[in-house]
Amino acid sequence: MTARGETPEVETREDEEQSVKLAEILELLVAAGYFRARIKGLSPFDKVVGGMTWCITTCNFDIDVDLLFQENSTIGQKIALTEKIVSVLPKMKCPHRLEPHQIQGLDFIHIFPVIQWLVKRAIETRQEMGDYIRSYSVSQFQKEHSLPEDQEFEHRREKAVRTLSETLDVYRPRRKYKRQGGSAELMDEESRVHSTLLEYGRRYGLSKQMKPEKPEDRKVPVPQGLVGKGEVKEEEELRAEEELRIKALMTEMAAMGMEEGRLTASTVGQIVGLQSDEIKQMVSEYAEKQSELSAEDRPEYLGAAQQHRRKVASLNKQIGQRKKLLDQLQEKASELQSGSCEAKKQLTEVTSHMENLEQELLVLEKVESKADPSVLQKLRDLVAQNESLKLQEQQFRSKCREEMSRLQQNIDSLKAAATEHGEEKEQSQAFEQQYKAEKEKLQKIRLLLARRNREIAILHRKIDEVPSRAELTQYQKRFIELYGQVSATHKETKQFFTLYNTLDDKKVYLEKEVNLLNSVHDNFQQAMASPSVRDQFLRQMEQIVDGIRQSRNKMEKKKQENKMKRDQLNDEYLELLEKQRLYFKTVKEFREECRRNETLLTKMKGQTP
């Protein structure tokens, strides 16, 4: 802050790629329906964070923020807000990673894929909700209201159904006759069919094709001139036989009442009580047996229609079997398809995990490239040394185990030999001493290894304590923001103090003026009473006016001094600005010369053999 309370301008460098990404983010948010991003008075942080919060809320996820009345928040509020947003993203299964400092630092390159995914998810959720609300509205409308066409259709449908049921009831088959109990049983199938049809009032005669031919009729040829007469005669004979046959059947029947022949409710209940599968099986078996019996008893009556019915029945049976097989295959196909979907889902999860690992690897490589090479090399040497020591320890332990097993075998063998020769005590003491020495040596090596591990851990902590370039840049940005806020607050406070002092001085002068006017008003009548008092009053007024003039001259002099001081400070400020411009220009030229020097050095190195 300068002596005049003004905030110095800090040079900021806007990255072109960041600006492009910010423009793309704002275009995405406006296209998705977040029109608050068009307001020019808002900061990029408020636009981006507001758009992210709007997308998250649109996707039916809760986030504890309030952006309606807290624009241009402080750093603490921004940090809390970004942490809440980042904590919600994993719940939404966002495939992109984002940190709070990236949002707060306006890293639009990393924010853009998250915004893109959120906008896509918000549009999909809005479409789903639109379809759901539309279908719900239609269903509610259909429950409460109906169109004239629907009402007319319902009326016509009820009328048509009622007419159809009445027609079916009127024209349904009714049993008019019934065979008597003592009548003879019909043996052939054709007679049974005719008898059943006659019970329902239907009379059918034998056709010409259904009449069985006699062997003698097939052998004797008929002359061409007598063909017509023979056919007429045969038809008359058939008709007469049919009439006799019907009369014979009708003599065995008796007329039925309207309610006879109907099944009672108990009989229907007993029939329905049977299992449907058993009924179907019994019906199919009965049909097969009946067809076999009829084929065996009277093969001459099997015509083309009956053979066609048998083929149709067999084909229907095959169709049923194939349908069952098709259902089984469809179930297997659905199971395979579900397995394929699960495999694809696992594949996408694995690929996303692999991409995350690759991104983490790239971040680690960037951090490694920005770190100090000497410290990294030292750390690599220590890690390699640690690994070599661990390997040596493992090898030494394995050797010690082998040696211990070998020595144990020697001890056992020596014990066995010592029992024979009487030298067990001396050899056991020697082995004990050797074992203690090896044990002490192993303990020393372990202590050295622990010391090295502690040193490596201390170095790890020291390296972790050193901030990276990105963290330093973040700290610098935060300090600049804090400095700007402190300077703005200081400037505002200084203005308040100056205003207070000015108003206080004005108040003092106004009080003096009021007191003077009151005293003049109080003493004016007495002073005008006598000439001597009037002269004294006038002299006092002249003295007061002279004092006011002197005070005014002092204030004018002080004003001129402050004005001169201001002009002097302004000149110094302009000189400092000129020096600053010259400094930035010199730094820029120096960087350009350094770059040219580096290019020339690389060219010279490339030309030298």
Curated annotation (Swiss-Prot):
It is found in: Early endosome. Keywords: Coiled coil, Endosome, Protein transport, Transport. It comes from the Eukaryota. GO terms for biological process: Golgi to plasma membrane transport; protein transport. Residues 229-459, 510-579 form a coiled coil. GO terms for cellular component: early endosome. InterPro entries: CCDC93 (IPR039116), CCDC93_CC (IPR019159), CCDC93_N (IPR048747). May be involved in copper-dependent atp7a trafficking between the trans-Golgi network and vesicles in the cell periphery. Belongs to the CCDC93 family. This is Coiled-coil domain-containing protein 93. It comes from Xenopus laevis. The gene is ccdc93.
